[in-house]
Amino acid sequence: VAGICEGRVVVVTGAARGLGRAHALAFAAEGARVVVNDLGVALDGTHGDPNTSTGPAQQVVDEIRALGGEAVAHGGDIATTEGAASLVTTALDAFGRLDTLVNNAGFLRDRMLVNLDEDDWDAVMRVHLKGHFLPLKHASAHWRAEAKAGRAPQARVVNTSSGAGLLGSVGQGNYSAAKAGILGLTFVAAAEMGRYGVQVNAIAPAARTRMTERTFAEAMAAPEDGAFDAMAPENVSPLVVWLGADDSAGVTGRVFEAEAGRVSLM
């Protein structure tokens, strides 16, 4: 039986670990060909030990291929024009099309407001907000050109906000502001790009990742008794795959909370 993303080409940013990895594997399981983007940076965005951080995107590509799927790695910095543009060209060169963009990349530099310096503010705003804007801009330009050439796409964008973007989070002024900005960007992009066959939605997920394990260790811990692992990142991915598929036709400009196996429409 064909998956709901059979024939689609999907780009996932920040896809080497956590939610991004779960999304990439889930899309591949539903028949998509996947561009796996990741820089392999540490939790705070700095480059870690080169012996442990090299090639994380390729590792996920290898997982997908081992399961019979198709994928390629992309190691560009999506918060640069060159890196974001090459996301699109990588998809086109490898698979001949681009159907879905999942903006997921990010990291944390948590500080209370009075201790938050400009570097920490700028770095977090750059990866989250600019790292959403630039891939969205370049993918949208491609889809607009396709539509104007008479090849109207059924394109999908899934942006990643957070409960911090909806309600704020103590010690995360930079992160909360960036995630709130992503919501505004989502609403504008949905309004502007609908005429070209592009749907744009956002999720506000809660899941166990490198970013949350340290900050919310107790809440994110996996159960020891084999019970349902409510905070596993794989619980969020079915929603993302559906939003990235043809099946979500007509759904745009919306925000979905996904937590502990539950989905709420905001």
Language-model regions, residue ranges each:
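Canonical Rossmann dinucleotide-binding motif of NAD(H)/NADP(H)-dependent dehydrogenases/reductases
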Residues: 3-36
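A glycine-rich helix->loop->beta "capping" turn
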Residues: 5-6, 67-70, 90-103, 109, ...
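The beta1-alpha1 cofactor-binding region of Rossmann-like NAD(H)/NADP(H)-dependent oxidoreductases
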Residues: 54-55, 75-86, 118
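Substrate-binding pocket helix/loop in short-chain dehydrogenase/reductase
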Residues: 112-113, 120-122
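Active-site helix of classical SDR
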Residues: 136, 178
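Residue(s) in the substrate-gating loop at a strand-loop-helix junction
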Residues: 162
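C-terminal helical subdomain
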Residues: 223-266
